[in-house]
Amino acid sequence: MTAEMDIQNSIRLELSRHGHYVFRANVGKVRMPNGRIFDTGLPKGFPDLFGFRGSDGKAFFIEVKNEIGKLRKEQEHFQQAMQITPAICGVARSAAEAVRIVEEG
């Protein structure tokens, strides 16, 4: 079984090779050395990768899952909410699938 981080890295490289701009979303909370909690501020369910197509600037959001990974409820809600926007949104389990989502979306 492939680690999601490995799939994510291969997707980032392949989308960049295809001329797209892609960023990794770091989500979560961290306790700082001073004891305060730092929250990234992204909403629950925000996808692992986001960016825009190099050809037309259209935004995309990609949730990365391995072969057996399933969406959490928050991730399902984000995917559903994006359906009414002009942005591209999908779930990818490989670099080829991510390229297809972005370029055919």
Please name every model-derived segment.
Residues 1-105:
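Catalytic phosphate/metal-binding cores of nucleic-acid and nucleotide-processing enzymes, i.e., regions
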